[in-house]
């Protein structure tokens, strides 16, 4: 019941966002998007900590390198200094491309979480669904933003996800689940950073305060 109530509240928030955002300024839209991306990154960090609490001893050794994340092919700024040199149109394009690239992986994680061999799989499953909700909400908000910014900001890079199976044994499932979550956490941090830079520019804050 609590889950349904929470989902209803978020759904109403999304509806309010879609209906009202067309009538408000770009800086306010940036602020709302930044708040949602911050929540997205916070949730992914919490999930990673949950997974760390019950991780196989050899997990760190066996887990694929970050360069194996399916979004690694997308060229993005490596730090804030580089991000500050990137145009608004490119930053919003990168954020939307990363967000879209996680639709299918989040579906996979959502389907695997309830039976994950982890004592907190119920909480993990609930948080994954929250990630999906916030990702959808943020994506809807960014769509409205680019409509205000113009055609040059609407380009999205297509990033295919070829994974569809976490493995058959318990260790493989835990490691691959954790790997995907670590990739998402990395990308959610990028999305959050890009949107915060955009927010700073929209509100004409000094770059060093972004």
UniProtKB/Swiss-Prot annotation:
Disulfide pairs? 69-183, 200-210
Q: What is its main location?
A: secreted
Q: Which Gene3D superfamilies match?
A: 1.20.1250.10
Q: Print the organism lineage.
A: Eukaryota, Metazoa, Chordata, Craniata, Vertebrata
Q: Which organism is it from?
A: Salmo salar (Atlantic salmon)
Q: Which Pfam families match?
A: Hormone_1 (PF00103)
Example GO BP: positive regulation of lysozyme activity
GO molecular function list:
hormone activity; prolactin receptor binding; superoxide-generating NADPH oxidase activator activity
User: Which keywords does this chain's UniProt record carry?
Assistant: Disulfide bond, Hormone, Secreted, Signal
Can you name a GO cellular component term?
A: extracellular space
User: Where in or outside the cell is it found?
Assistant: Secreted
PANTHER family listed in its UniProt record? PROLACTIN (PTHR11417:SF5), SOMATOTROPIN,PROLACTIN (PTHR11417)
- Could you confirm whether the keyword Zinc-finger appears in this record? no
According to the record, the signal peptide region is 1-23
Keyword Ligase applies: no
- Protein name (database record): Prolactin
Q: Which family does it belong to?
A: Belongs to the somatotropin/prolactin family.
